[in-house]
Amino acid sequence: MKIVLANPRGFCAGVDRAISIVERALELYEAPIYVRHEVVHNRFVVEGLKQRGAIFVEELHEVPDDNIVIFSAHGVSQAVRKEAKERALTVFDATCPLVTKVHMEVARASKKNIEVVLIGHAGHPEVEGTMGQYASDSAGMYLVETPDDVIKLNVKDPSNLHYVSQTTLSVDETADVIDELRRVFPEIQGPRKDDICYATQNRQDAVRDMASQVDVMIVVGSKNSSNSNRLRELSEKLGTTSYLIDCPEDLKEEWLTEQTKVGVTAGASAPEELVNQIIEQVKAFGGTAVEELTGREENMFFEVPKELQIKTVS
């Protein structure tokens, strides 16, 4: 049974930066370091940071006074930022710069009283943070997930409308929603550049290229990882039986029975160390040669905040 590795896969620049921020904070300041929400949606990563002294909370009221808090890569609302400032908490912001770009689009629209439609999944922390960038009382912000949601929209001024999207969505499904928005609201404006992040796009393209070459697809990622779920869904849509797993123990031998080629990819928050562990488990179930496909080269890099680049704490 041949093992075929997608390329690119795994960590993106935003995830690398977010994890580095927590690691540097733990190095420069005494534990505990508080992190609002899982810094990235990967159980393996979160457990490793917990062991080093990071404490993950869902709300700021769980952070004691006079402490450090890190905002996760998914971003936070303006209300959360305001609360942190009012409590004089020391904040390090691990929001992915590509999410910040979307936040800035919403904030600009809000200042101009332009209504905004966000394409995204209800309840996802990135969506909650992006919705929380809209401050205008004279216009509104709306969330849609599907083309059917667009038809139900009742905006105040169809001629004064802008759309943005969650960065980790399915490229194809987002395109369908955008097409419907433009059909229903011909004057709607969008971002100059697609909001879907480069890593999401690249990993979906890699799965699209690989799906027809394998009998079964293993996607390494946590159940709460949006981009990992989209990889599994895309592979299934392309006709390949696919599974999302969090660790080697999740892999079932019967999934691989009588298969000749198994594909392996990983969401943007899954580390290569975990991918390697799962490859070893596939080998234990009969995997032999490993072939890594060629793919789009990624050289994006996001720096950590300047305060965390210093060598010592003054």
Curated annotation (Swiss-Prot):
Organism: Aliivibrio fischeri (strain ATCC 700601 / ES114) (Vibrio fischeri)
BP GO terms, sorted: dimethylallyl diphosphate biosynthetic process; isopentenyl diphosphate biosynthetic process, methylerythritol 4-phosphate pathway; terpenoid biosynthetic process
Highest taxon, organism lineage: Bacteria
Record keywords: 4Fe-4S, Iron, Iron-sulfur, Isoprene biosynthesis, Metal-binding, Oxidoreductase
Names of the cofactor(s): [4Fe-4S] cluster
Active site: E126 (proton donor)
Enzyme Commission code(s) on record: 1.17.7.4
InterPro entries: LytB/IspH
Gene expressing this chain: ispH
Positions of isopentenyl diphosphate binding: H41, H74, H124, S225, S226, N227, S269
Function statement: Catalyzes the conversion of 1-hydroxy-2-methyl-2-(E)-butenyl 4-diphosphate (HMBPP) into a mixture of isopentenyl diphosphate (IPP) and dimethylallyl diphosphate (DMAPP). Acts in the terminal step of the DOXP/MEP pathway for isoprenoid precursor biosynthesis.
Protein name: 4-hydroxy-3-methylbut-2-enyl diphosphate reductase
